[in-house]
């Protein structure tokens, strides 16, 4: 099924793919008349990734029918990283088994990536009984994860009324990042009960890599439960991570 899809701002799209490529080696993207979607798990099955990009966020979206295309994420990332912020990204597929990627700026550069067979995972995004929901600025969570990585390989999230804390403890060091609604970095918090859970820093680092400074990130978690991290792409697109907890001894 041929298609042509145009996205203004190649660098932004590249950052999105780079974030996912840190966790998965290959992906099956479903291309329909409504938009592009992808759901995958990392090889260790610790993180579930759910991506949804509606047709409305693209400047041109010509798709007739439905097709699933499999790609090597590292190859796709390397090509897209060649794009600049003001360049236009064009994705095309004809009758051949290739994805054609064009970067249009002062010149038009075109790459062809071979499509591969990727097994689609049949897993739903579960509805979990989260007891805490936090909306935070992207820069805050990115810096907190960097700080935590200096002292430990896991970070604890703690939410209670009007207060959200991220804490990491090593053998001799510890770091704590605390926010209340008086701080600019914490935009909203809803807590049913005091909630605590720990998560692996290596996974968190990959998940927050593509966040912009002013991006709003929604974090939902429960006591020793998976954490759902969600952020929007141009208001309507959405990237969700579901990360298994680090069970503490």
Curated annotation (Swiss-Prot):
GO molecular function: DNA binding; DNA polymerase processivity factor activity
CDD domains: PCNA
Matching PROSITE patterns: PCNA_1 (PS01251)
An example Gene Ontology biological process: regulation of DNA replication
Keyword flag DNA-binding: yes
Keyword DNA-binding: yes
Domain of life: Archaea
Regions annotated as coiled coil: none
UniProt keyword annotations, A-Z: DNA replication, DNA-binding
Gene3D superfamilies, A to Z: 3.70.10.10
Record Pfam families: PCNA_C, PCNA_N
Membership in a protein family: Belongs to the PCNA family.
Subunit structure: The subunits circularize to form a toroid; DNA passes through its center. Replication factor C (RFC) is required to load the toroid on the DNA. Homotrimer. Interacts with NucS.
Described function: Sliding clamp subunit that acts as a moving platform for DNA processing. Responsible for tethering the catalytic subunit of DNA polymerase and other proteins to DNA during high-speed replication. Regulates activity of NucS endonuclease and prevents non-specific cleavage.
Protein name, per record: DNA polymerase sliding clamp
Organism: Pyrococcus abyssi (strain GE5 / Orsay)
Lineage: Archaea, Methanobacteriati, Methanobacteriota, Thermococci, Thermococcales
């Amino acid at each position: 099924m041929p298609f042509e899809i145009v996205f203004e701002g190649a660098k932004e799209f590249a950052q999105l793919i780079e974030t996912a490529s840190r966790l998965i080696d290959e992906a099956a993207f479903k291309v329909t008349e409504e938009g592009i979607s992808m759901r995958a798990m990392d090889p260790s099955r610790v993180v579930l990734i759910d991506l949804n990009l509606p047709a409305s966020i693209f400047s041109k979206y010509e798709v007739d029918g439905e097709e699933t295309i499999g790609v090597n994420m590292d190859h796709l990332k390397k090509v897209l990283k060649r794009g600049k912020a003001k360049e236009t990204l064009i994705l095309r597929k004809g009758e051949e088994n290739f994805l054609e990627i064009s970067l249009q700026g002062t010149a038009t550069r075109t790459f062809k990536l071979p499509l591969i067979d990727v097994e689609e995972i049949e897993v739903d995004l579960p509805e979990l009984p989260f007891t805490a929901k936090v909306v935070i600025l992207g820069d805050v969570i990115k810096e907190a994860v960097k700080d935590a990585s200096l002292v430990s390989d896991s970070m604890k999230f703690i939410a209670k009324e009007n207060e959200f804390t991220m804490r990491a403890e090593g053998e001799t060091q510890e770091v704590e990042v605390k926010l209340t609604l008086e701080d600019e970095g914490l935009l909203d918090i809803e807590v049913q009960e005091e909630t605590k859970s720990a998560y692996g820093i290596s996974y968190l680092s990959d998940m927050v890599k593509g966040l912009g400074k002013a991006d709003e990130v929604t974090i939902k978690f429960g006591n020793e439960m998976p954490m759902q991290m969600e952020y929007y792409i141009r208001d309507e697109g959405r990237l969700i991570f579901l990360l298994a907890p680090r069970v503490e001894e």
